[in-house]
A protein has these predicted regions:
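Non-transmembrane, juxtamembrane loop and terminal tail segments
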Residues: 2-27, 228-245, 253
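Membrane-embedded alpha-helical bundles of multi-pass integral membrane proteins
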Residues: 12-216
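Membrane-proximal cytosolic interface modules of multi-pass membrane proteins
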Residues: 170, 175, 179, 183-187, ...
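Reductase modules of NAD(P)H-dependent flavoproteins
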Residues: 200, 285, 291, 296-315, ...
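Ferredoxin-reductase
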Residues: 228-317, 379-380, 416
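Histidine-anchored nucleotide/phosphate-binding helix
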Residues: 275, 348-366, 390
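Beta1/beta-strand and adjacent pyrophosphate-binding region of the FAD-binding site
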Residues: 337-344
Length: 486
């Protein structure tokens, strides 16, 4: 660590505000859901409560039968269906109205989707059971007449979507998640045929979704992209450098498509990826951008294998489409005096983009509050370091030109399954984020710390809770988190 004189902050928080910060931002694991902060848990409970209120409200005559209840469950599912489509739009109306980006709003899409599933399960399951009791025929219970046939097929569509939306499938078989989600078309068709109220409920939401798809189509086709370099890096990562005139911020992500990778399927297969370059990177005045894709599924694995074998993958041959950029870090890192960037595995991509951007601004003399940057990267072994070895070495070399008495650039790489000899950069084992945050707090004395973290859910939860534990009256630790999957 370089020695620098970083002035202490005179800020002082009240005990109440510190505890509110700790409680409101603490992370929990909720069975059936991804890890979430306490504030998200409150929103989830409010959402569930609101749905239960509409399900269980007293009926007009004060008397409700089982049939009344299950039919009301269908209407609650319809009400949620009105929101599930606009909540999945990337060019979201919610960004315009309340400033919440797609990656934050998508969790509400998942919640409404699951609520639709549970309400249809209550509605359809009860009717199927009643029909089976009356006929003792499974086929008649499921497909006995048009009402049962269309209802069963609509429910089957939802079952497929819910199963393939699991976080494990989104991460390791993104194409299965991507393609299975198009069964929502059958959900709409059979839903309309099943109930006359379905179309009025979902018409507006579907209209917003269609508009979003048109915007994405235009954005991804209107600007040409030139692939400058495609490079397979060991342990299954493909580095793609491309040229495109666009504005973006460090830490943003996009969706990429390589139409001629494996046509015809690749014509419509998109994959989410964080931009690993900084907005300022240029080569002779030409804006260059970089993405790193880890071979975790069919699409990314094929890209890596073809790049490694040089099978029709020269930069001039590979075509690329780009939908984005999207998202925005919840913290303005350039406005924070002390910044810690934590990443696990390929989750380093948005964090190294932020690191590059901060160092570029420090070197260029642009207005910047950041004086201390702590970069923590957790990877299995030294081979994974090759993903960004040249970038980190180049960054550290450039940062050496900064005055030691003003700036700190501290890089630590933790190897969890390697016997590499520890050095000033490499360390064996998993880090204690609580210890690292305590060390930074002790060194700087007072003032807020901005933490960015991207990696596995377990890591994000640990970092968040360590940040809350180290928040006190002399400085709060604020966290911006990103996950692997959308």
């Amino acid at each position: 660590m370089s020695v620098a004189v970083v002035p202490e902050s005179n800020i002082m928080y009240s005990t109440v505000s510190v505890w509110m910060h700790k409680i409101w931002n603490s992370a929990f694991h909720v069975v059936g859901f991804e890890s979430m902060e306490f504030n998200e848990l409150v929103l989830l409970l409010l959402f569930i409560t609101l749905n239960l209120i509409f399900l269980l409200l007293p009926f007009e005559n004060g008397v409700s039968t089982a049939s009344d209840l299950v039919n009301r469950a269908a209407h609650v599912a319809l009400a949620n269906s009105a929101f599930v489509f606009p909540l999945a739009t990337r060019n979201s109306v919610f960004v315009t109205l309340i400033g919440v980006p797609f990656e934050r709003i998508i969790k509400f899409h998942r919640w409404t989707g699951r609520m639709i599933f549970f309400m249809i399960a209550l509605h359809g399951g009860t009717h199927i059971q009643q029909q089976y009791s009356a006929t003792e025929s499974i086929s008649k219970a499921l497909f006995g007449d048009n009402q049962y046939l269309t209802g069963s097929l609509a429910f089957l569509s939802i079952i497929i979507i819910v199963i393939t939306s699991h976080a494990v499938i989104r991460r390791f078989a993104f194409e299965a998640f991507w393609w299975s989600h198009f069964t929502f078309i059958f959900f709409i068709i059979f839903g309309v045929l099943h109930n006359e109220w379905f179309a009025p409920y979902v018409a507006f939401g579907i209209s917003l979704y269609v508009v979003d798809r048109l915007i994405r189509f235009v954005k991804s086709n209107i600007k040409s992209i030139k692939v400058v370099n495609i490079e397979p890096i060991q342990t299954g990562v493909t580095r793609v450098v491309f040229e495109r005139d666009m504005h973006y911020e460090a830490g943003q992500y996009a969706f990429v498509n390589f139409p001629n990778l494996n046509a015809p399927l690749s014509l419509v297969t998109w994959h989410p990826v964080s931009l690993s370059s900084a907005p300022s990177i240029e080569d002779d005045g030409i804006p260059l951008h970089t993405v790193h894709l880890k071979a975790a599924g069919g699409f990314t694995k094929m890209l890596y294998e073809k790049a490694r074998n040089q099978s029709g993958m020269s930069p001039g041959v590979l075509r690329m489409k780009f939908d984005g950029p999207y998202g925005k870090p919840s913290l303005e890192f350039s406005e924070q005096r002390t910044v810690m960037l934590v990443s696990g595995g390929i989750g380093v991509t948005p964090m190294i983009s932020i690191l590059r951007d901060l160092v570029d601004k420090q070197l260029s003399g642009l207005p910047l509050a950041t004086q201390a940057i702590y970069f923590i990267w957790v990877i299995p072994d030294i081979d994974s370091y090759a993903w960004f070895a040249s970038e980190l070495q180049e960054l550290l070399h450039r940062a050496s030109a900064l005055p030691d008495n003003k700036y700190i650039i501290d890089v630590k790489v933790f190897l969890t399954r390697s016997q590499t000899t520890p050095s000033s950069i490499f360390f064996q084992g998993r880090p204690s984020f609580d210890f690292l945050l305590k060390s930074v707090k002790d060194f700087h004395g007072s003032g807020d710390i901005a933490v960015g973290v991207c990696g596995p859910a377990v890591m994000i939860k640990e970092v968040k809770n360590s940040a809350m534990a180290r928040s006190d009256r002399y400085g709060l630790v604020n966290v911006h988190s990103e996950t692997y999957e959308l």
